[in-house]
UniProtKB/Swiss-Prot annotation:
GO molecular function: serine-type endopeptidase inhibitor activity
Family recorded in the similarity comment: Belongs to the venom Kunitz-type family. Sea anemone type 2 potassium channel toxin subfamily.
Coarse class of the protein's main subcellular location: secreted
Protein name: Kunitz-like toxin PcKuz2
Task of the protein: Weak serine protease inhibitor that has been tested on both trypsin and elastase. In vivo, is not lethal to zebrafish larvae.
Annotated InterPro entries: Kunitz_BPTI (IPR002223), Kunitz_BPTI_sf (IPR036880), Prtase_inh_Kunz-CS (IPR020901), TFPI/VKTCI-like (IPR050098)
Intrachain disulfide bonds: C1-C51, C10-C34, C26-C47
Residues spanning the signal sequence: none
Length: 51
C-alpha cells in the first residue's frame, strides 16, 4: 500500500483503486490492464480493507 500506483503500458483502460499514502486514502486511477503492482484494487472497499 505504500508503493505508488502503476498504470502500466497496455491499452485496456479500466478504473482501479490504489492507496495514496501521502493523502492517507484510497483513490481511483486509470489502469491499462497490464503491469500492475500490489497497490491495485478492483474496488474502494478492497483497497480500504487491505490498506
Amino acid at each position: 500500500c505504500k508503493i505508488p500506483a502503476n498504470a502500466g503500458n497496455c491499452n485496456n483502460h479500466q478504473e482501479r483503486w490504489f492507496y495514496n499514502s501521502h493523502n492517507r486514502k484510497c483513490e481511483t486511477f486509470l489502469y491499462s490492464g497490464c503491469g500492475a503492482n500490489p497497490n491495485n484494487f478492483k474496488s474502494e472497499k478492497q483497497c480500504e480493507s487491505t490498506c
